[in-house]
Amino acid sequence: MVTIEEMGRLLDDIADSFPEELFNELSGGIVLVPELKLNPMSVNSDLYILGEYHRGFNSGKYIIIYYGSFMKVYGYLEEKELRERLEHTLKHEFIHHLESLAGERGLEKEDAKNLFDYIMLRDWKGRK
């Protein structure tokens, strides 16, 4: 299992590989927290939040990565595969950031649709 310190180094390596322009107006940067975060819409406690993009008037713009959620979902993976999942999540959150700067909400809508599909599938499976 990758420790939070090791994951922090992986996250730094990934972020360092991104173009500097992506970080424009990301005043709070990327924050790795130890918590596990369950999606409030989770059915049977099986949907975890891996990362979140925050934009607030007082707190600025920043990305949170949840170490505990990553370990719950991907803790069995080797470091290389975990790094790929981490990079995918970070790119996803950066798309939210860039869309926010552009006044777009395409990925937010896609995330909402995916959550709706998840809920409907879980509901359908529960009725079988």
Language-model features: locations:
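N-terminal small/polar-rich segments of proteins
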Residues: M1-I14
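Long, hydrophobic, amphipathic alpha-helical segments used as structural scaffolds
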Residues: L22, L26, L98-R105
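Amphipathic alpha-helical interface segments used for dimerization/assembly
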Residues: A15, L90, F94-E99
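Generic alpha-helix signal with a bias toward terminal, lower-confidence helices
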Residues: I30, P34, L38, S42-S45, ...
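Mid-chain, well-packed structural core segment of small domains
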Residues: G51-L90, F94
